[in-house]
């Protein structure tokens, strides 16, 4: 797949500890323009997208249903009449494990656009074509069950699977660490020339970055096991033992730790003292 379509970006004015400099809304092509991630519901941001596209938006693509990516869809779709493409609704694409946890009432929900629905659902490998670009949908769950990346020639728009400035939040039941590793492996096997993350600058050396992220998660799992050697604890307890970060970031760290614990439980390395919930106490298996 070789595609030299023009790529432009409009940075949303939503910087934060979780979004970095803000959400990147990408515009692909010139004669017919595809917008990847309209971003937050910010009128000035949507106007900036419309101005840059010069009235030629034909497709609206959404990597996943978090408010900083999908909340602007309705405003942009109303202005352009362009169809909206995504994997599915906000709760779509969950692994069987995460679907079962959601049914028990386990809540993640950070920034989820619960009412999001695309006009057209995409599946892994499907292609969208225009007169000057071809985009292939890649199902890349991990950060969220219905997360899509989009392949344009030797470039991949990777949403929040890979960030240009930090690691991604994995918050069950939306996020799944097992899926995350599989998705990193998928991108590595595709060997893109460049990754365009939804937050941060383009990644010109994708393979080292993908390897770095996988190694970081493996190290975090090892740290959690070491922390459990000191005694059982909840995800919050373990996060406090492991992380040295500002207090306002600790809730996200606790969700990441829970994701690791669930993956370690699948491997038989840890066990909880009851049904999975946010305040479940965990210990080393057999301990």
PLM features: residue spans?
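Conserved beta-strand hairpin/beta-sheet module of binuclear metal-dependent hydrolase folds
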Residues: 2-52, 149-164
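Active-site HxH/HxHxD metal-binding segment of metal-dependent hydrolases
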Residues: 19-21, 40-131
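Metallo-beta-lactamase
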Residues: 33-35, 40-42, 101-103, 107-110, ...
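Histidine-centered divalent metal-coordination motifs
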Residues: 63-69, 143, 147, 199, ...
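Aromatic/hydrophobic pocket-lining residues that form the small-molecule binding cavity
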Residues: 70, 180, 184, 257
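C-terminal regulatory/interaction regions
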Residues: 226-287
């Amino acid at each position: 797949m070789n595609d030299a379509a023009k790529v432009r970006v409009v940075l949303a004015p939503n910087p934060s500890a979780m979004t970095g400099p803000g959400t990147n809304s990408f515009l692909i092509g010139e004669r017919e323009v595809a917008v990847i991630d309209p971003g937050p519901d910010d009128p000035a941001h949507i106007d900036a997208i419309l101005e840059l596209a010069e009235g030629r938006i034909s497709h609206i693509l959404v990597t996943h249903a978090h408010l900083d990516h999908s909340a602007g869809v309705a405003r942009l779709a109303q202005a352009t009449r362009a169809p909206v493409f995504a994997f599915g609704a906000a709760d779509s694409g969950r692994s069987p494990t995460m679907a079962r946890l959601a049914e028990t009432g386990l809540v993640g929900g950070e920034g989820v656009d619960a009412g999001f629905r695309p006009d057209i659902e995409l599946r892994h490998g499907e292609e969208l074509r225009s007169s000057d670009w071809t985009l292939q949908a890649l199902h890349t769950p991990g950060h969220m069950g219905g997360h899509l990346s989009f392949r344009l020639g030797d470039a991949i728009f990777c949403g929040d699977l890979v960030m240009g400035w930090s690691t991604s939040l994995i918050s069950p039941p939306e996020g799944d660490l097992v899926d995350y590793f599989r998705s990193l492996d998928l991108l590595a096997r595709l060997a893109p020339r460049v990754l365009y993350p939804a937050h941060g600058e383009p990644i010109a050396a994708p393979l080292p970055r993908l390897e770095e992220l996988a190694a970081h998660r493996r190290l975090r799992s090892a740290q959690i096991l070491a922390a459990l050697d000191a005694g059982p604890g909840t995800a919050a307890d373990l996060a406090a033992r492991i992380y040295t970060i500002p207090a306002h970031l600790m809730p996200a760290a606790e969700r990441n730790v829970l994701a690791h614990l669930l993956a370690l439980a699948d491997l038989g390395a840890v066990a909880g003292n009851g049904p999975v919930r946010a305040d479940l106490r965990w210990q080393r298996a057999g301990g």
